C-alpha cells in the first residue's frame, strides 16, 4: 500500500499529538504520585514547540517588512524611470519630425533662392 505525502504528513502530526498526550498523562501521574518531584518536571511551555516565538523572530519580521518596503520603493522608481524613458522617446520623435519638416522647408527655400538668383543673373546679363 502506498501513502501520499499528505497522508504521511498528517500521520506524523497525529503521532506527535499522541506522544504529547501520553507524555502529559505521565506527567500528571508523576504529580499525583510524587508531589516532591513535580519541581523537576518540564512545564507545559517547554513541551510545546515554539512556533514563531523565538527571540529573533521580531527582528526577522522587521527585516522582512523593511525589505518589502525597499523592494516596493525600488519597483516604483523603476516604473518611473521606464515612464520617463518612454516620454523622452516620444518627445525625441516629435523633435525629429519637426526637424525633418523644417529641413524640407529649408530645402524649398534654397530652391526658391536659387531660382531668384538665376533670374537676377538673367536680368543682369540682359541689361549688360
UniProtKB/Swiss-Prot annotation:
Where along the sequence do coiled-coil regions lie?
A: 90-111
> In the record, which positions carry Phosphoserine?
24
- Pfam families found in the cross-reference section: DUF4577
Record keywords: RNA-binding included? no
Keywords for this protein: Coiled coil, Membrane, Phosphoprotein, Transmembrane, Transmembrane helix
Subcellular location, record wording:
Membrane
Keyword Coiled coil listed? The answer is yes
Q: Which residues cross the membrane?
A: 66-86
What is the predominant subcellular site recorded for this chain?
membrane
An annotated GO cellular component of this protein is: membrane
- Membrane topology, from the record: Single-pass membrane protein
What's the protein called, per UniProt?
Leucine-rich single-pass membrane protein 1
Q: What is the lineage of its organism?
A: Eukaryota, Metazoa, Chordata, Craniata, Vertebrata
Amino acid at each position: 500500500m502506498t501513502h501520499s505525502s499528505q497522508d504521511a504528513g498528517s500521520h506524523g502530526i497525529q503521532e506527535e499529538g499522541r506522544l504529547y498526550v501520553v507524555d502529559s498523562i505521565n506527567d500528571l501521574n508523576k504529580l499525583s504520585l510524587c508531589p516532591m518531584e513535580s519541581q523537576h518536571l518540564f512545564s507545559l511551555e517547554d513541551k510545546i514547540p515554539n512556533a514563531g516565538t523565538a527571540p529573533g523572530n521580531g527582528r526577522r519580521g522587521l527585516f522582512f517588512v523593511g525589505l518589502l518596503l525597499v523592494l516596493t520603493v525600488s519597483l516604483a522608481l523603476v516604473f518611473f524611470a521606464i515612464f520617463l524613458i518612454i516620454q523622452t522617446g516620444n518627445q525625441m520623435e516629435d523633435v525629429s519630425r519637426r526637424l525633418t519638416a523644417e529641413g524640407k522647408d529649408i530645402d524649398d527655400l534654397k530652391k526658391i533662392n536659387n531660382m531668384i538668383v538665376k533670374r537676377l543673373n538673367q536680368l543682369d546679363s540682359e541689361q549688360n
